[in-house]
Amino acid sequence: MKAISVLGSTGSIGTQTLAIVEDFPDQFRVVALSAGRNLSLLVSQIQRHRPDVVALADQALLAELKDRLMALPADTRPEPLPHLVGGPEGLDVVASWDSADLVVTGIVGCAGLLPTLAAIRAGKDLAVANKETLIAAGPVVLPELKKSGSRLLPADSEHSAIFQCLQGTPWSDTARLSTGVPTPGLRRIQLTASGGAFRDWSAADLEKATVADATSHPNWSMGKKITVDSASLMNKGLEVIEAHYLFGLDYDHIEIVIHPQSIIHSMVELADSSVLAQLGWPDMKLPILYCMSWPSRLETPWRRLDLTEVGQLSFRAPDPAKYPCMDLAYAAGRAGGTMPAVLNAANEEAVAQFLEEKIHFLDIPKMIEGACEQHKPDLAANPCLDDVLAVDQWARQAVREQVNRGTRLRGASMAA
């Protein structure tokens, strides 16, 4: 039985991970959980899974969590109560919990970086749904992986598809991820993208895009931030950078293809020009399960793919004019160093500002480009962890300042 630690247990990835544990009680058990502020859901997860340790990102909520657990009926209250920890140190405890065999990282954004590093330094294998860890800190993470022997297993559908395709090659032993060197025999990666909420919109129509529009994904059920990233295609741009670090390919050999049906999750072209693809319904539980069961596969009762039901699979090239975030991501990846960290942080902040309706959808790439341009003179080619954390905070502030300037300008214009 494999012992699982879940970072971000109340989020989309975390809840799906725990659902898998419930589907396979003879294969997995939960030993550690971390969460943000959703105490009601967390309490129910503790009741059901009885972990050894639980961490809250906000240490101030620990007393309330303990009170809620103590108030449970005696027949449903875990005995003994889990060890409760809080703050960044608490997240590190969950990430490096001694009995955990696999750490599932479902914390959204750069907030997942430090606990992911803690897990790596503890020698844990990781199921990585937090793509920002490699994007922002690839030059920091790869040496730590080499030092500890940890393995990163991709829990997002696209990189899981690539990983699964490579398991069928003679060099699959070298495709265990995150060595930072090219995977032998791998010529090209094609990352498929649904096109997001605006795939059937014209570039001109995006002027009137609302938050509700951007957070309505046609195929996948995801959190708001990543759904907006899908609408802007930034999610795919970030995945290009992640694929570069995971599989060692140059950016010129990692392509994005719009595939509206979201049935092919990605493709690899091998040295002999063969192309391998992984197919399945758009369901995040499949790549998460593969991470959890790897190198084995578990039989599931889940819905099986019927291509006659799908009818057709279509593909088209993405329009750079409609998706400017895509080119920004390629440029940041090629610049390397601290630039991907700036790109990632600026995007996180710009999306947050959009979700609060402080900026328009088309302002998101403008804010990101502004931060990246400002950072060019200060780019660190070989960053350490402190460099990454510093530029992360700087980029967020740079976006906030752009938003504030724009607000003041709009206010002055209206007054005139």
Swiss-Prot record:
Enzyme class: oxidoreductase
Cited InterPro entries: DXP_reductoisomerase, DXP_reductoisomerase_C, DXP_reductoisomerase_N, DXPR_C, DXPR_C_sf, NAD(P)-bd_dom_sf
EC code: 1.1.1.267
Cofactor: Mg(2+); Mn(2+)
One annotated GO biological process: isopentenyl diphosphate biosynthetic process, methylerythritol 4-phosphate pathway involved in terpenoid biosynthetic process
Residue positions binding 1-deoxy-D-xylulose 5-phosphate: K131, S157, E158, S194, H217, S230, N235, K236, E239
Pathway entry: Isoprenoid biosynthesis; isopentenyl diphosphate biosynthesis via DXP pathway; isopentenyl diphosphate from 1-deoxy-D-xylulose 5-phosphate: step 1/6
Function: Catalyzes the NADPH-dependent rearrangement and reduction of 1-deoxy-D-xylulose-5-phosphate (DXP) to 2-C-methyl-D-erythritol 4-phosphate (MEP).
Name this protein carries in UniProt: 1-deoxy-D-xylulose 5-phosphate reductoisomerase
Organism field: Synechococcus sp. (strain CC9311)
Gene that encodes the chain: dxr
